[in-house]
Regions:
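Long, terminal "pre-/pro-" and other extracytoplasmic accessory regions
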Residues: 2-158
């Protein structure tokens, strides 16, 4: 029985690796210094943040679209502002307390948790209305994200 050559053994993983080399990821993000954001983005983010402290900035590219997330904190609660490259606000994620949730959302999260640990809960606002509530649930060493409409219906993944 002959042994395969080293070239043959390495060629399969190498071809697999190179096959994806030219394909950009669907979603990529990186932390960037806030002063490097476009002027309009920084100006609108600061106006939206009001008196909150800016913790950091993230540059995101998803499906070819560039956006920026400005992470803020006020009174111990996080609030993240997502803006497009022109400075228009796309959405705001704001930490909320469990007792502030609509009853249907609280019930949906409790049901999804199945006794697991519920992480920080955020409201996601698009335009002038809350579009969804998001959280993470950790159970048996597994962590998963869940999202619900304000009426408590599950939000389908994009």
């Amino acid at each position: 029985m002959s042994r395969p050559s080293l070239l043959r053994v390495l060629s399969i993983p190498l071809v697999a690796l190179l096959a994806g080399a030219g394909v950009p990821p669907a979603h990529a993000e990186s932390h960037v210094p806030c002063h490097t954001l476009p002027d309009a983005v920084l100006r609108h983010a600061k106006a939206e943040a009001e008196s909150a402290t800016i913790r950091g900035c993230v540059k995101e590219k998803e499906n070819g679209r560039l956006s920026y997330e400005v992470e803020t904190v006020k009174d111990g609660r996080s609030r993240d502002i997502l803006l497009d490259a022109s400075g228009s606000i796309l959405e705001v994620e704001q930490e909320v307390t469990p007792d502030s949730l609509p009853a249907a959302v609280a019930a949906a999260i409790a049901k999804a948790a199945h006794g697991g640990k519920v992480g920080m809960i955020e409201s996601v606002t698009r335009g002038d209305a809350i579009a969804s509530y998001e959280t993470t649930i950790t159970s048996k060493g597994q962590r998963r994200e869940v999202a619900f409409t304000p009426q408590g219906a599950p939000v389908k993944a994009d």
